[in-house]
Amino acid sequence: MKLLKVGLVANAANGSTCETIISALANQDILEVCTPIVSGIQDSIDSVLANIEQEVQIPICKISRVEDALDGKINIIDCCNTESESIRYMVSSFLNNMVDLIIDLPSEICNSKDETALISLINETLSNEDGKPLNWTISGNVRTLLTTGDTLVDDIREAHIALRKDATLIKPRFAVVGKDDTSHGNIASLREEKIMAFGPFEADTFINAKHYLPYDAVLFCDEDSACQRLLAEVDEGCSFEYISGLPLVVTRLNGKADLTQSMLKEVIYFSIHTHRNRVRYHGATKHPLERQWIPRGRDDFKLDLTKEVSE
């Protein structure tokens, strides 16, 4: 079985974060399902290895090109000095079928401008034909998405497509949290398109009563603070961003928390699972069944057996 090549961008990582990355990737369970390619830690890898207590030899392979990556090894690539250069290089490698996934490991100081810049950077490099990119935040089993009143309906449509592809949900259910009651009609009209969207709900009641549990995703319409409240409510120690609507799977670890091995492993497994879901979806919908009737034929013809057939 071909192993997926996972590009990890770690240019902004400090020494302790690099140590965590190497320790997590050295796990045999990770190396059996993917081939990690890490950029940004080539200058500190020797000192990091000296600090790690090694019971067995860590399989490190230093490379200068993605195509030289070896399965069963932690491939440290020495080619890019900044985060933006690494992302461009990884995206270019994806276009050449040499990288399957990208995971961005930002610095400890991270904000929405960084996330917007990441999406813009990828859009500049990719010719995107998979729809509008949406930046999700995932914590545990809860998916959240920030939106505005102007783009709410379009974002719900894009989110519906994204969860069908990436989460194999046939009819994903969406809850909209917001104060604009006039959007109720627009949300209800989506159900005529067989999109299961409901709301808008009042934020305090929705979160306090845990009304989010039956839904597959929650969209916060101009309710940034309420979104943060919900994420804090369901926090299980691993919160990360995931960008849908791109031809490749891109995840971004939340830089506001200290990186742990379990967090990195969860994001890697999530990315691989999402990639496999996309492959299954495209395989199932690539060649739809053709109609089994002749458009110009008549289905109201009646055979009269009392008449003789003229030759």
PLM regions: where:
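A short mid-domain helix/strand-loop element embedded in enzyme catalytic domains
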Residues: 139
